[in-house]
């Protein structure tokens, strides 16, 4: 019996000596080489990466990470001398983070120290977004300079009542040559002439535009030409909220709808292009206005797999094809191409510029009323870093960021950009008006800084508050409301070349 006990004890000791690292001998040691690792201290960059570690062990060890959510170990087949990988995910924080990896074999333990650097962040200086940008020399900068200070003849030829466009339907008197001469005298250099064609388009398949309306549009364009102004003509409220014939929502819903609407769209643009084929390069065509499904970029376009975006891009291509095919000066005319809803972000993300037989003759058209609760709805009284009383929740930086993104995407690549609409409604007190003036001067100076041509929205409204954006009388060309304060400030913002006058100087002189 005693001999049997000795044999059992000897066998047990032998088994313990060759067992896995997780089992200890009576003396607490294991057979084979001692557990070791190199290096013991790991320092990794903020990006997701791996680092190799050489491990020597008598048998397969266990690995325990103190931060397994971002620091893990990859180990292959065991060998007494092997290589493992310590893996880290991206550290999106600016702060470094630390973890430890324990390598355990029996009662032996080696600890690896893991440090991952934080994401490198360039400290933002308060004046960085106000820095002066050296004007470029490419086509984008050249065209923006040519357009200069723009203005909209809004709520005029785009006005409509019960589905019929009428120049005086929304309260403005008939435009005259004096209107455009007055604009020129005040420093305006370009005019956007929105045109609604509702009620003036005949039946399929010709879709003939009635002569009286077409001739009136041509007459107003002639006013701009005679005054020496650049001009933009478009199809405006025909696509408003997808309520009328130029409905992006219906066109995206079926092939039949798309084909029917596109046929009318092409027919209308063929007639417009032919009417103005002999006009010089002062005239720019813009295919449509703010096309969306009625939800201003927050509707079905977010879930339809890009169907509405594709329609907008396809219509832009059809527009270019039709205009170029009419010949004359249209073969090389500048054409403005809006993205979905004319929203800058949606345009950057989804606009596909049409193929064009004329090189460098396409402009990108976007609108910007940021923040709209201040500029259009008048829910806030003041805006910017100096605002105190009922201030808008966003300030100058987001506005500049919009322009920076447009510059990076388009202007730096030689593609001109213009804000077909921008502005800020009139206010009722002198202090509120001073912030309105500051917003507009800052916005327009930023446009000049980033090489973007801005067109002020003017709807002729002389009251104050929501949607009241009258600065110049649409019939006489004289100032109305506080236009005598606003327009000279915008002229200064766009054309002042004194070194002391900068975006930062405008910022520093905000109302207090």
Could you say what each language-model-derived stretch is?
Residues 121-190:
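N-terminal carbohydrate-binding accessory modules
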Residues 153-175, 203-209, 257, 373-398:
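Acidic/histidine-rich helix-loop elements
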Residues 34-35, 57-85:
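Surface-exposed binding patches on compact interaction domains or structured appendages
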Residues 133, 171-191, 206-237, 241-287, ...:
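An active-site-proximal structural segment forming one wall of the substrate-binding cleft
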Residues 6, 13-41, 105-106, 111-129:
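Bacterial Sec-dependent N-terminal signal peptides
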Residues 259, 263-395, 404-424, 449-452:
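Active-site region of glycoside hydrolase catalytic domains
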């Amino acid at each position: 019996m005693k001999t049997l006990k000795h044999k059992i004890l000897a066998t047990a000791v032998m088994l313990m000596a060759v067992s896995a690292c997780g089992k200890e001998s009576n003396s607490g040691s294991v057979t084979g080489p001692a557990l070791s690792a190199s290096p013991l201290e790991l320092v990794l960059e903020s990006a997701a990466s791996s680092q190799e570690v050489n491990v020597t062990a008598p048998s397969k060890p266990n690995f325990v990470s103190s931060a397994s959510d971002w620091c893990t170990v990859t180990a292959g087949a065991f060998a007494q001398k092997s290589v493992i990988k310590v893996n880290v995910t991206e550290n999106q924080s600016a702060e470094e983070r630390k973890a430890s990896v324990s390598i355990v074999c029996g009662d032996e333990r080696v600890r690896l120290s893991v440090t991952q650097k934080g994401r490198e962040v360039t400290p933002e200086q308060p004046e960085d977004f106000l820095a002066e940008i050296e004007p470029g020399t490419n086509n984008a900068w050249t065209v923006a300079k040519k357009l200069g200070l723009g203005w909209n003849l809004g709520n005029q030829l785009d006005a409509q009542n019960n589905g019929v466009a009428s120049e005086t339907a929304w309260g403005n008197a008939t435009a005259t040559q004096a209107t455009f001469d007055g604009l020129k005298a005040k420093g305006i250099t370009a005019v956007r002439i929105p045109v609604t064609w509702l009620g003036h388009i005949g039946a399929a398949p010709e879709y003939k535009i009635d002569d009286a309306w077409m001739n009136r549009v041509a007459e107003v364009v002639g006013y701009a030409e005679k005054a020496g102004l650049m001009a933009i003509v478009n199809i405006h409220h025909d696509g408003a909220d997808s309520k009328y014939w130029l409905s992006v929502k219906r066109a995206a819903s079926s092939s039949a709808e798309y084909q029917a609407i596109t046929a009318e769209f092409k027919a209308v643009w063929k007639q417009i292009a032919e009417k103005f084929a002999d006009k010089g390069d002062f005239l720019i065509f813009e295919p449509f206005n703010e096309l969306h499904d009625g939800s201003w970029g927050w509707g079905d376009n977010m879930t339809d797999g890009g169907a509405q975006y594709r329609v907008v891009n396809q219509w832009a291509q059809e527009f270019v094809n039709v205009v170029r095919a009419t010949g004359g000066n249209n073969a090389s005319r500048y054409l403005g191409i809006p993205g979905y809803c004319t929203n800058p972000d949606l345009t950057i993300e989804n606009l596909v510029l049409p193929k064009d037989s004329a090189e460098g003759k396409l402009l990108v058209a976007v609108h910007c009323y940021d923040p709209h609760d201040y500029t259009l709805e008048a829910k806030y009284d003041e805006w910017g870093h100096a605002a105190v009383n009922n201030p808008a929740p966003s300030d100058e930086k987001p506005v500049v960021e919009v322009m920076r993104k447009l510059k990076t995407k388009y202007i730096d690549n030689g593609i001109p950009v213009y804000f077909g609409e921008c502005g800020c409604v009139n206010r009722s007190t002198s202090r509120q008006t001073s912030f309105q003036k500051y917003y507009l001067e800052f916005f327009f100076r930023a446009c000049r800084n980033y090489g973007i041509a801005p067109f002020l929205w003017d709807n002729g409204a002389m009251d104050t508050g929501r949607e009241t954006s009258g600065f110049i009388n649409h019939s006489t060309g004289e100032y109305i409301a506080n236009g005598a304060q606003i327009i000279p400030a915008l002229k200064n913002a766009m054309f002042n070349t004194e070194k002391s006058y900068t975006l930062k100087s405008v910022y520093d002189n905000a109302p207090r």
